[in-house]
Amino acid sequence: MKTIVKNGRVFDGEALTRQDILIEDGLIQAVGLGLDETGCQIIDAQGQIVSPGFVDLHVHLRDPGFAHKETVETGSMAAAAGGFTTICAMPNLNPVPDSPEHLQVSLDRIQEGASVRALPYCSITEGEKGEKLVDFEALAGKCAGFSDDGKGVQQGEMMRQAMIRCAKLDALICAHCEDESLLDGGYIHQGEYASLHGHKGICSASEYEQVRRDAAYALETGCRYHVCHVSAKETLEIVRQAKAAGARVSCEITPHHALLCDMDIAGDEGRFKMNPPLRSAEDRAAIWRALQDGTADAFATDHAPHSAEEKSRGLAGSAMGIVGLETAFPVLYTGLVKKGILSIERLLWMLTYGPSRVLGIPCGVVPGNRADLVFIDENTIDVVDSRRFYSMGKSTPFEGMETQGRVVRTVCQGKTVYREER
């Protein structure tokens, strides 16, 4: 069946223009006006933005191994509801995808249950234990890249050797940067809120010192090196300088780090606990500058669901991580676009073209590409209500936030995988 998307304002990477889109066999066949509608199903996008499907570089599906937190089915449906047609799944699973055999377990679960395209990462070290590097040569090309997310690679020479080998394969290293020797039992940012309320803090140096180390290795080796969930202003300056020096370095920003700071923590609640933590207002201002000047390459949610019990133990005792797939667009549109910090075009670029470039995959509403599309209503007012989430995880710092703009339909490879029910 052929499908034509009509009357939408289509994002082409630079601007929103009135175009129609012909879809057949899961691919975009034509883009333009006056397309032949004979025998076509019609999707009327009047009054809506039509963008390439969003791409999330950083998602925890928790499956296999931790299905009490999330499953491939629930996580990918949350992605669809958020407008994401491609998600990259982190490897802190059981089994960890650290060998072809273990990777196949993840691929089989994705094949069975995913409603959007899910690309798994393999780990950098066996079992994410930081002791022995994986067989990169046996895994490259079968995964999105390599990450020990949830942990930083503590040994510098081990990371350097990983980059040397990945550079030869043109494989991506996606790094959670955290020097464990600097954590000192902290669980929120070492800043004003922690001081006022007697909480143990995590210093920003635990992030940026490891980024400084790795950026030097990236420049030396030529490896594609991506920094996960940047939270500190110093990290952004290191990335900025590394790019200027010619390193193949990129970085991502989460919605919560872009919109919140430590002083937004509203009481001793686990929904404000994530890693890295919400940092200072000064760090948030630096993030805005990085979003505007191109230092930051992509938004990524770091969607990290946990059970209600695991998030009910307050700031000190709760598991680290919040959900983000279903709230990303409305909170970013409300908090950045409506306040004049970013244009709608820049926001869309960082949810589509930016992360696609990091991965090295095609992006754009152009003939020959996958028909992965998100339909957006910019005007509707809503309130974040975790009871409506498809995700099994309900912990969000944006609970109760009034938002403007929402995803109304998601099409993945030509198939509607989400349509709003209201």
How would you describe each model-predicted region?
Residues 57-70, 93, 119-132, 199-204:
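Active-site mouth loops of central-metabolism enzymes
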Residues 133-299:
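Histidine/acidic residue-rich metal-binding segments in metalloenzymes
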Residues 8, 21, 26, 47, ...:
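Divalent metal-coordination and catalytic microenvironments
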Residues 46-113:
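Metal-associated gating/positioning segment near the N- to mid-region
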Residues 108-124:
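A glycine-rich helix N-cap at a beta->alpha junction
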Residues 1-52:
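Histidine-rich, glycine-flanked metal-binding segment
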Residues 8, 314-317, 370-422:
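C-terminal cap of metal-dependent C-N hydrolases
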Residues 196-224, 271, 292-293, 297-299, ...:
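His/Asp/Glu-enriched, well-ordered alpha-helical/loop segment
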